[in-house]
UniProtKB/Swiss-Prot annotation:
One of its GO terms (biological process) is proteolysis. This is Protein TMA108. The active site is at residue 331. The gene is TMA108. One of its GO terms (molecular function) is zinc ion binding. It comes from Saccharomyces cerevisiae (strain ATCC 204508 / S288c) (Baker's yeast). Putative zinc aminopeptidase which may be involved in ribosome biogenesis.
Amino acid sequence: MSDNLLSLENPVVPSHYELRLEIDPKQSSPNFKGSAIIHLKFNPNSTTLASIEDSFTQFKLHSKDLIVLSAHATIGSTKFDLKISQDTGKHLSIFNSESPIQLSNDCPLILSVQYVGKIRDIKTHHDKTFGIFKTNFMDRKTGTANNHVVATHCQPFSASNIFPCIDEPSNKSTFQLNIATDAQYKAVSNTPVEMVEALDSSQKHLVKFAKTPLMTTSVFGFSIGDLEFLKTEIKLEGDRTIPVSIYAPWDIANAAFTLDTVQKYLPLLESYFKCPYPLPKLDFVLLPYLSDMAMENFGMITIQLNHLLIPPNALANETVREQAQQLIVHELVHQWMGNYISFDSWESLWFNESFATWLACHILEQNGDLSHYWTSEPYLLQQVEPTMCRDAADVNGRSIFQIAQRNTGIDSQTSDIFDPEAYTKGIIMLRSLQLATGESHLQKGLESVFEDTKTFHARSVKPMDIWNHIGKFLKSQNITNFVSSWTRTPGLPVVKVEVEEKDGKTQTKLTQHRFINQLSTEEKDQLEDVPYQVPLFGVLPDGKMDTKNVLLTDRTLKFDYPILVINHLAQGYYRVSYESEECYALINDKITEETLSEIDLRKIFLDLSQFIGDEGFQNSIHLHGLFKILNHIASPSTKIASKYWDPLSKGLEVLQTIDRASLTSSKLQSFLKKKIVIPLFNKIDWPHGEFDKSTNPHELKVMSQVLFLNKNSAKCAELCQIYFKHLLQGPRSSVPLELVNSILVVVSQHCANIKQWKKIFDLVKRSSCTGITNHVINMYDQNSSETAMLIQNGAIESLGFCLDSDIVKKTLNFITSNIESEGMELALFGFNYNFKKRLNKNEKPQDQVVRETIWEWYMGNFDQWARKATRKGTTTGDHLHKALRSISLIIFQMFVADEPQKIEKFINLEKEKLGQSLLSLDDIWASVQQDEESRKTIRRDLASLV
């Protein structure tokens, strides 16, 4: 925090709060009345009070939007009258005593405060929910909007909107809440209701809640209002039974799935931690609005209701169920980690959230509700891979520890403190640590943490305190070193694997460095390259895990046996570069045997995709290794096992990148076709009739990629004409949607006359596409409108693949006439693949090259388009600005390899006309040049293999 911490500055800290709040949601005044009796004790961390024997005259508490009316303090029978002043900038109430206050070990300083606070009225999702807030909603019986729900949100610094306190996570106290409110309302808080007492008015009552365990102010909470509820009892360890309730303002029957999930997983978590659930009850309160979506208040979890009020028809969707369960169990984990054990700074929020997600996913997977999560696409491809790519793209990237050092103040919201990058890296770190340590060992280590209540519950701690404790318990320094390495070292490593035969023996050498994409020589020299603690997860050629070498802690490691793959199942946060022929030969052997995991093969291709085209990292072995695997899969003697279609599609994505880079060389293009594309095309069993509706979607993706890569082939064109006829004429469900784009591209590429082209051009009209949607096999259940749109976009993208000069002119005229329509620039897509080819007329080659025709068209229209595109604030201007940038990007790519001066001259002339930055042509050109450097790198090593 940027503000001075009261937990360090103040002579006293709270040990107990007794609160009475008077809340009437119906009243027009947006205020509540509050009184607090706060027990204060000597602060051993105080910078202003050396010891308990010293006296003081001033102390402070946080208070935001509170008007303190009066205050006094007592120690035993001694009373201290207090003067109150406000520091509104720092949100402090300052209490001054005329006589010195001398603390005693026997008697606390008891502060009594009367005050008034605000209740915020929340009407939309854009309104921020913090402190106490209320929402009115329609009574479904009367049809009037006079029902109310009042709730709280205290994280990170909004408890001080409810009562004067030290609103910092380092301070843990107990709480006893009393609420005076309308008798018609349900009232829920952290602890059970202990007593309900009628007040003078028969319509009001006082609800007294039991005293809480030690907890931070951020997880204090309550809710009152017109709430429906579901309730059950859950049996826990030791024949203990606790009530669990779900509250919501409406549709409470739709909360049954939430209740069932809590009933299943609360006992499982208690068993996992070997620590009793810390409270005598648990409630979920589902609210119409909640800015942070969910809040793990101790014993009273609040969640925005649309996440957990799930109607039966929605529960049929597996993804909906899994997301709801992840959310519920995540919040349940917090009852132990985050609430019972809490952290002394918001700098640890990443760990608190990462831990809850990691353990929730582990427990759900272990108990059959999140099948194969840690090897699933949502985890590996939607979380791990994008995070690694971002990390490798930033030479100035920060470690988790550095990210967490945020300059937060008392006005900060959770969104200001939470960092998704640190959170995701934290989950990955915990998962890899779990595997490296052993699931049962890590669980026992965590059990030992919860056993030590004096250290881990009586006070707030740091995450590293937990790992130091577990390391000592397991007698392993590697635990602490591992966590320290992954939290304090920025970026991610790449591990190079070299296998060689020496004196009749196999020797494997591993070398690690930090991995950064497109690193210049100067940046490489300045890069901090500290070795990571890398969990190897190695697999031996016999398929067993390598148990001899499990952790790479130094720069290099050598051992005298071969390794098949490391980072098995992609569970580690690093890239692997296989840099020996022997590595790829071994991989191919296991593909033949079908013993190589499909996830491992996909990971090999994913990592190669990061190396290929990277001037500072790519070498010829990466291209050779890719070709060796793809050629092996394409060979007639190798069967493509169904499990390999998915990784093969990733390998072909890398090949498409190489294919795009080789467009300037017919020799390189011929090499790729002959070595991989044609053998793969010949190997695939292409249906000449209807497709099997149960065909693997990944197989269909591979088919689509192979058709596109083989688009110049007459044999491919003949096949696609059959599919194109089925697309236009049927029968029903005869062409997979996944193949439509590639079919259209191949047909367009081989169009010989206007009549043929018009069949494709007709599909540019949405109405024509709508009429053929029933001819398409739709694997992903898009509706007919979505399917028609996809066919239409595919048709537009395919127009530019035709080489007939008359058709090219018609395509360009079509773009010109419709330039103000969304997506028309897509029609240029094909020209970018044929830009070096000669146009033909009546199937006879002409002198003019495609890109020369495109350039004449571009130059003839640019100034007119640019004038319109630079009219800011108009719909046409904004759209044309975007379209013209896209068109310029495509055309610049056609000349960057061999005529860059042409583009540079054009940009300089246009800047004189239009101004320096109206279209940012310099930025577009810089991006194109950067991409070309990557393509040059590919061509450099590709040429050496041809």
